[in-house]
A protein has these predicted regions:
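Positively charged n-region of N-terminal signal peptides that target proteins for export
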Residues: 1-7
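Beta-strand elements of well-folded, non-transmembrane domains
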Residues: 119-123, 139
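A solvent-exposed, acidic/Ser-Thr-rich amphipathic alpha-helical stretch
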Residues: 34, 52-107, 129-130
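Short beta-strand segments enriched in hydrophobic/aromatic residues
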Residues: 59-60, 117-119, 152-155
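A short hydrophobic beta-strand element
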Residues: 108-119
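Bacterial N-terminal signal peptides
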Residues: 7-17
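Short, low-complexity N-terminal intrinsically disordered segments enriched in polar/charged residues
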Residues: 20-61
């Protein structure tokens, strides 16, 4: 009987050691990936050119709602692009930086992100505007690319 007990103890110890040795870290990204902070920064680098055509590839076409600081809303990328050109017409330079508080929440073929974005903009008159604003975006994977299907940009009331 002692040899049976000895075998049992050895078996339990071996299984325990094997279970600890076979631990693997879970993948840091879900299958299919999600936009990452570098991707988010590319979008804002495009906006820094003050030319919406430089960010068009990041936005879905069709009837989607985009909320920017002004006006109240846009119902499609075409409306957004046309409206933003007017809003940016008074500026000669801009730089946007996605802050370290960016959060990316993957959910299958969708992902939603939140971040604050640092702005440094110079008007054609020379007046400089600096601050931070809030950004929330919903991405959808379309044809292998992550595109924004809903966006909200806002500044805190002062």
């Amino acid at each position: 009987m002692p040899s049976m007990f000895y075998r049992f103890v050895v078996l339990v110890l071996a299984l325990t050691a094997w279970s600890f040795a076979d631990t693997k870290k879970p993948a840091s990204k879900p299958a299919g990936g999600a936009p990452d902070k570098a991707h988010l920064q590319k979008i804002w680098d495009g906006w820094g050119t003050l030319d919406p055509s430089n960010v068009a590839e990041y936005y879905a076409t069709g009837p989607h709602t985009f909320f920017d600081i002004a006006p109240l809303k846009y119902a499609s990328w075409d409306e957004y692009k046309a409206g933003v050109v007017k809003e940016l017409a008074d500026y000669k330079a801009a730089k946007f930086t996605v802050n370290d508080d960016a959060e990316i929440h993957p959910a299958g073929q969708y992902a939603w992100v939140t971040a604050t974005v640092k702005e440094d903009m110079t008007q054609k008159s020379g007046k400089r505007e600096m601050g931070n604003f809030r950004w929330t975006a919903v991405f959808e994977k379309q044809n292998g690319r992550w595109v924004i299907v809903h966006e909200h940009v806002s500044a805190p009331m002062q």
